[in-house]
Amino acid sequence: MTQTFTTGLMGAGKSRELIERFNADVTKKVAMAAHLTEETGTVGKIESRNGKKVKAIYLNKSHSKEVLEVVKNFIFMKNIDSIYIDEVQFFPKSIISDISKVAEESHVDVHFFGLSTTFTADYFEASELLLKIILDENIIKISMGCQTEGCTEKAEYNARMVDGKVAREGDTFLQQKSKYLALCKKCYFC
């Protein structure tokens, strides 16, 4: 039984990596994705920026008991060997902890994908938990370059841009679309 956490900044290719690994996995598997508005258990998709997609079961972060029941149903009723979960940063850490425990007790591989930090450079609680409980060799960090024009440094921060400037405060979860850039330390703090 293996648990992995693949993380990176916005636009680094986490969903693409999930889809590639999911398609290469020969075990009986299911893909799931945290969702802010869709009902738990509805069928949707995980789609990467390159247009590739895979069918997925949506898990609403607000429905903790339902999320765990859906996961248990796939493990025990459908005999799933591997679970791939995208956008884990949206979950409360209690859901991640419960999924991790159920998967471990059932000898099911679970592969978590998501952001580690918010636009304010604070850890998402679910991601912080995963960084603590998953073995270092099973944490995969996808890197990318700074998106500031002319900068060649490695990006380290998800920056929410408001009126062309880095926003350092505000609600973590927004319903409307916002512009984000992956920035290096120098460009983030300038």
Enumerate the predicted regions with their spans.
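Catalytic P-loop NTPase motifs of RecA-like helicase/translocase cores
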Residues: 90-92, 119
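Walker B catalytic acidic pair
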Residues: 86-88
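Sensor-1/coupling segment of RecA-like P-loop NTPase cores
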Residues: 103-127
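A short helix-turn-beta junction within AAA+ P-loop NTPase domains corresponding to the substrate/partner-engaging
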Residues: 127-146
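Conserved P-loop
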Residues: 1-73, 118-129, 152-154, 166-190
